[in-house]
């Protein structure tokens, strides 16, 4: 065992992510006992298209679960349940009799359904299904991806209508395989993943037949919608059946919702922000379903067993960590990602430069696909160190815009922001965040909040933890940054940022 003070029992969590799958074993204090991880191939058949091989992913999931258990030096008797968290919206259709995918999974970033989404919104605009689903018509969501497969793979629609095919996001694929696959695998999804298909009605928490018909997805393909924390079935069959047969599969949450749960944001108004390639900020809105008029998504936060559904508001930023990578790989201004902080610290401010990284348009709160990146305010005075600072400030200003939108929609002021993800190791960025959103920024001890959230939900489902109070008691602060910026300077610079954002819009003309 990796940790001398850790005695069982344990909970395991699978994180089926965009670039890799991993499994983490946690103890009762929410501490990490072991980790195993394996990357899978990113497939780019055409510009704007992104696919994954779901068979490769299932193979990797089995490997990392076996690997994490082996590294922890434990057996099936030590593991009380396994939970699942996953990249959201990534869409798969498979044959229920053979277990074979009919096509690669279409990944959330894939934009091939742009034209279909425009067509679906033709007379009514992108808010056609927003009142029921909380989502704008965008290529991001799963329903239109399923329709694309049905329209473009030979014979698929007939097979779907005959009841031979199953649709699912990655949680559904993993659960179906874990619980037996063709031999009685459970075809289920949880409310958080279902809320990202554009096919679930947030008011009824059930599939919306009218919307499914409008989008063109047969109801018989869809999984059963369950809560985020309950026993869906047991591990059976296959490689893991021998190793871990009988262990309950007891939670599923989309990755951002899992991070909200892992950060113990259980009260209305509590908010977390995950800083990775892009950034996702999620606010718990309690039992209130808040329609956003400020460009946020209304979504499900989580649902524990038969307790009430907890809703959330979400704002997503397309480019944050990937802007630092761009500075390193395309511009050559830094040689490692960590260097951005060192370079930015050599100057006091941004030298008047503002960098809006609208590389593929702007996400929340604008949703403008015609925008492209801009560096504004350039003079001869500006050095690469000023640009490094402008790069970090871009992430902080975009967070501020979403925080403002959340306050506007919910009427709740942000009192603190819990953060996680790779970029949180950048202390200058964290201080800048606190300064710009004018609230304390807090980083927890366990950075793997996504996996932790799935483990927590699974543990609650089997009584490993009794209540969310137990989980709150586990949450430990590693670092906190408080605002140190003069309010007048903040307001002045925010104005300049908003001016720079305006300059990005309308760059692409319709015919492009």
Swiss-Prot record:
Enzyme class: transferase
Keyword annotations from UniProtKB, A to Z: ATP-binding, Glycerol metabolism, Kinase, Nucleotide-binding, Transferase
PANTHER family: GLYCEROL KINASE, SUGAR KINASE
Catalysed reactions, semicolon-separated: glycerol + ATP = sn-glycerol 3-phosphate + ADP + H(+)
NCBIfam families per UniProt: glycerol_kin, PRK00047.1
Binding-site residues for ATP, renumbered to this chain: 18-20, 277, 321, 325, 422
GO cellular component entries: cytosol
UniProt source species: Streptomyces coelicolor (strain ATCC BAA-471 / A3(2) / M145)
Function: Key enzyme in the regulation of glycerol uptake and metabolism. Catalyzes the phosphorylation of glycerol to yield sn-glycerol 3-phosphate.
Pathway membership, UniProt: Polyol metabolism; glycerol degradation via glycerol kinase pathway; sn-glycerol 3-phosphate from glycerol: step 1/1
Annotated positions binding sn-glycerol 3-phosphate: 18, 88-89, 140, 255
GO molecular function: ATP binding; glycerol kinase activity
Biological processes annotated in GO: glycerol catabolic process; glycerol metabolic process; glycerol-3-phosphate metabolic process
Chain sites annotated for binding glycerol: 88-89, 140, 255-256
Protein family membership: Belongs to the FGGY kinase family.
Positions of ADP binding: 18, 22, 277, 321, 422, 426
Ways its activity is controlled: Inhibited by fructose 1,6-bisphosphate (FBP).
Protein name per Swiss-Prot or TrEMBL: Glycerol kinase 2
InterPro entries reported in the protein's UniProt record: ATPase_NBD (IPR043129), Carb_kinase_FGGY (IPR000577), Carb_kinase_FGGY_CS (IPR018483), FGGY_C (IPR018485), FGGY_N (IPR018484), Glycerol_kin (IPR005999)
One Pfam family matching this protein: FGGY_N
EC number, as in UniProt: 2.7.1.30
Taxonomic superkingdom: Bacteria
């Amino acid at each position: 065992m990796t940790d001398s003070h850790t005695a069982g029992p344990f909970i395991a969590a699978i994180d089926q992510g965009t670039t890799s799958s991993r499994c983490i074993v946690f103890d009762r204090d929410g501490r990490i006992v072991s980790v195993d991880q394996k990357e899978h191939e990113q497939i780019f058949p055409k510009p704007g298209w992104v696919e994954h091989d779901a068979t490769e992913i299932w193979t990797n999931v089995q490997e990392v679960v076996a690997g994490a258990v082996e590294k922890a030096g434990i057996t099936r008797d030590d593991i009380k349940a396994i939970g699942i968290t996953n990249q959201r919206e990534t869409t798969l259709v498979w044959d229920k009799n053979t277990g074979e995918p009919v096509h690669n999974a279409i990944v959330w970033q894939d934009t091939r359904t742009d034209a279909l989404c425009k067509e679906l919104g033709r007379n009514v605009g992108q808010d056609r299904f927003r009142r029921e689903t909380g989502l704008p018509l965008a290529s991001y969501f799963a329903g239109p991806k399923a329709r694309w497969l049905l329209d473009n793979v030979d014979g698929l629609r007939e097979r779907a209508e005959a009841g031979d095919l199953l649709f699912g996001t990655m949680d559904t694929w993993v659960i179906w395989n874990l619980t037996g696959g063709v031999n009685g695998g459970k075809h289920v999804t949880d409310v958080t993943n279902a809320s990202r298909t554009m096919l679930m009605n947030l008011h009824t928490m059930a599939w919306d037949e009218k919307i499914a018909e409008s989008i063109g997805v047969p109801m018989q393909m869809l999984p059963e919608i369950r809560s985020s924390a309950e026993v869906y079935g047991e591990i059976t069959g296959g490689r893991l059946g021998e190793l871990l047969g009988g262990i309950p599969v007891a939670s599923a949450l989309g990755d951002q919702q899992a991070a909200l749960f892992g950060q113990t944001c259980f009260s209305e108004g509590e908010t977390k922000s995950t800083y990775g390639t892009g950034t996702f900020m999620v606010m718990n809105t309690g039992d209130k379903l808040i329609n956003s008029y400020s460009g946020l998504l209304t979504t499900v936060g989580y649902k524990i067993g038969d307790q009430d559904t907890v809703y959330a508001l979400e704002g997503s930023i397309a480019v944050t960590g990937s802007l630092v990578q761009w500075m390193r790989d395309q511009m050559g201004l830094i040689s490692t990602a960590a260097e951005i902080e060192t370079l930015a610290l050599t100057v006091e401010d941004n030298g008047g430069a503002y960098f809006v990284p609208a590389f593929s348009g702007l996400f929340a709160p604008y949703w403008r696909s015609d925008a492209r990146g801009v560096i504004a305010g350039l003079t001869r005075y500006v050095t690469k160190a000023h640009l490094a600072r402008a790069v970090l400030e871009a992430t902080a200003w975009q967070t501020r815009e979403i925080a403002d939108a959340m306050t506007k929609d919910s009427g709740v002021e942000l009192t603190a922001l819990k953060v996680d993800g790779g970029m949180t190791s950048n202390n200058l960025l964290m201080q800048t965040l606190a300064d710009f959103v004018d609230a304390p920024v807090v980083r927890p001890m366990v950075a793997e909040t996504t996996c932790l959230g799935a483990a927590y939900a699974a543990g609650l489902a089997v009584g490993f933890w009794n209540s969310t109070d137990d989980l709150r008691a586990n949450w430990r602060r590693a670092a906190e940054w408080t605002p140190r910026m003069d309010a007048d300077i903040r307001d002045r610079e925010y104005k300049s940022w908003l001016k720079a954002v305006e300059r990005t819009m309308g760059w692409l003309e319709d015919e492009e």
